């Protein structure tokens, strides 16, 4: 069982649900390691965006409020930081602020940047899992540390009915591991 293969299988599983849509930078075109996990996803399920992380997270919330399930892809935590306002003040709070009236389902995919074979410098290898866990009450953050963790975590994120959204954290250094 390979890390990359399990990610690809998980994306294909998510894509099989008619409500899912994949959104982010380099989802419809090559550009990141995550792009390679989407190569077999139908183009009509991929929404390519410019570099505008806060807008992307806001769009994800809007899609979720319209009964879609966005799979919002931020290749690294360091990019996701630019969407923290939407994540912490809106997505995490919308169910509470609406007295349970709105409970969107949003799947957020991010990663800890790879350090090998080339270290991209420290602004690309952050892991903000613990900080986000402390700031959010209705978002579960799951680190995908082993290949066998991947499919069950993505399946849980799609099937959950506990009004929680999910951030799944991948490890860039594991993409090429056997």
Which residues are covered by each model-predicted region?
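Thiamine diphosphate
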Residues: 1-178
């Amino acid at each position: 069982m390979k890390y990359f293969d399990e990610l690809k299988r998980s994306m294909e599983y998510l894509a099989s649900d008619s409500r899912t849509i994949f959104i982010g930078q380099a989802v419809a075109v090559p550009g990141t390691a995550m792009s390679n996990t989407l190569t077999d996803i139908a183009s009509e399920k991929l929404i390519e965006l410019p570099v505008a992380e806060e807008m992307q997270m806001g769009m994800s919330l809007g899609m979720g409020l319209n009964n879609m399930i966005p799979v919002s892809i931020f290749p690294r935590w360091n990019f996701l930081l630019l969407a923290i306002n939407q994540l912490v003040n809106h997505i995490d709070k919308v169910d509470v602020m609406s007295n349970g009236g709105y409970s969107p389902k949003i799947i957020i995919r991010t990663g800890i940047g790879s350090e090998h074979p080339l270290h991209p410098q420290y602004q690309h290898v952050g892991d903000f899992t613990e900080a986000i866990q402390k700031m959010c009450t209705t978002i579960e953050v799951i680190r995908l540390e082993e290949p066998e963790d991947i499919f069950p975590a993505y399946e849980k994120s799609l099937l959950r009915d506990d009004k929680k959204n999910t951030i799944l954290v991948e490890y860039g250094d594991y993409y090429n591991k056997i």
